[in-house]
């Protein structure tokens, strides 16, 4: 099978979701990815659920298609191992706090001297130049700092189960790496990529913040707040439906469906919004979710069910999407969620599960020229 990134060598030295998801996408589309961890393995190896000792579902999914090695870069020997890998690599992916790898002789300025064609991508909370660059932060912190928590409601803070800034940063990194690889074809040189979760969270709010036009609209755009025509409503059985009737024609169809034709011409009546919203709430409580969806012609005018994760995975829309792939692994039957994009000639390909920590130490280090005796010695000394 042809792969879009076949022949591209990636060293993934990230510990958390933003870098690992980026490396996963690159690997799924054919890149040869080596996952580097500390000698104790990444922290997520201990997350629940555990499929086997040292193998969490997180690791199995995010590190699929990657070879795994462990290296202690606090030692000179470990630093030299990583440098040997980087001499042969096309892409280096890391997520340490700014300055840490520089302190180990592995910063961009040092590494580019041994491999000018290397694309060096850093994914951090606040970027390399921010005065907050040393501040630790996870997705929950980032979406709070960026104002994203408040966008879906009027006063109540919303917490998403989806790591929005982390996944967004991953995809930004994939795009940036792809552009840098294309640019390298013209210039012959690699470059440095600085990806920030905070900047990603801000950029994802372009419609809601509307700051590029000079008018700071916070909460008054159709997508930046709840309106009676753009909201989630509870139904008789305690379930919910999404009403996304932004287009006037869809709004009119919705009003007919709920038998409130008097609201057809009041789509933008925000003066009486609370009253209109309550009318809709009362009416939607008279039927179950599935009864309303049947009347809504299964989404014909942007009225759709709100599913829980189990329902989302089991519904026909997901099954026919091609997003799920079930494979028989040594740990048992595993269902993987594939990348969202589909390439007609060079599709993604899930080839093997995520590795145990250091599973490919001997194979990878042997390819670098280290003897079996040296590899055993490295293990005994805590270098790998």
Description of each model-found segment:
Residues 2-41:
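Conserved small-residue-rich beta-alpha loop and adjacent elements
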Residues 11, 56-113, 285:
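A structured beta-alpha segment of the ubiquitous adenosine-cofactor-binding alpha/beta core
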Residues 15, 73, 97-98, 124-125, ...:
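Short glycine-/small-residue-rich Rossmann-like dinucleotide-binding loops
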Residues 22-25, 29, 88, 102-241, ...:
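Active-site-adjacent "lid/gating" segments in soluble enzymes
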Residues 28-68:
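Glycine-rich phosphate-binding loop and adjoining beta1-alpha1-beta2 segment
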Residues 270, 328-377:
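Flexible, small-/acidic-enriched active-site or ligand-binding loops
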Residues 298-351:
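A glycine-rich dinucleotide-binding beta-alpha-beta segment and adjacent secondary-structure elements
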């Amino acid at each position: 099978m042809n792969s879009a990134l076949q022949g591209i060598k990636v060293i993934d030295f990230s510990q958390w979701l933003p870098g690992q998801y980026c490396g996963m996408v690159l690997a799924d589309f054919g890149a040869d990815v080596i996952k580097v961890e500390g000698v104790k393995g990444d922290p997520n190896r201990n997350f629940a659920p555990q499929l086997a000792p040292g193998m969490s579902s997180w690791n199995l999914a995010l590190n699929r298609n990657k070879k795994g090695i462990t290296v202690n870069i606090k030692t000179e020997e470990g630093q030299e191992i990583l440098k040997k890998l980087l001499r042969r690599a096309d892409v280096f992916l890391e997520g340490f706090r700014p300055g840490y790898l520089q302190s180990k002789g592995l910063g961009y300025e040092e590494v580019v001297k041994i491999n000018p064609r290397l694309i060096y991508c850093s994914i951090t909370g606040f970027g390399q130049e921010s005065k907050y660059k040393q501040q630790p932060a996870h997705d929950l912190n980032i979406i709070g700092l960026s104002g994203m928590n408040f966008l879906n409601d009027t006063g109540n803070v919303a917490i998403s189960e989806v790591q929005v800034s982390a996944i967004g940063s991953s995809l930004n990194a994939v795009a940036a790496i792809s552009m840098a690889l294309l640019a390298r074809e013209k210039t012959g040189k690699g470059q440095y990529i600085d990806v920030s979760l905070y900047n990603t969270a801000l950029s994802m709010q372009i419609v809601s913040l509307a700051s590029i036009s000079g008018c700071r609209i916070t909460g008054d755009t159709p997508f930046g707040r709840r309106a009676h025509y753009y909201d989630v409503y509870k139904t008789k059985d305690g379930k919910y439906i999404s009403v996304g009737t932004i287009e006037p024609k869809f709004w009119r169809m919705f009003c007919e469906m709920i038998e409130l034709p008097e609201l057809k011409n009041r789509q933008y009546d925000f003066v009486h919004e609370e009253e209109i919203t309550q009318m809709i709430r009362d009416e939607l409580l008279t039927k179950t979710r599935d009864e309303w969806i049947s009347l809504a012609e299964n989404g014909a005018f942007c009225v759709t069910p709100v599913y829980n994760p189990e329902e989302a995975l089991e519904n026909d829309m997901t099954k026919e999407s091609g997003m799920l792939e079930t494979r028989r692994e040594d740990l048992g039957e595993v269902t993987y969620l594939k990348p969202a994009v589909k390439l007609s000639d060079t599709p993604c390909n899930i080839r093997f599960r995520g590795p145990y920590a250091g599973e490919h130490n001997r194979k990878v280090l042997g390819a670098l020229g280290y003897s079996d005796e040296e590899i055993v010695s490295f293990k005994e000394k805590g270098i790998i």
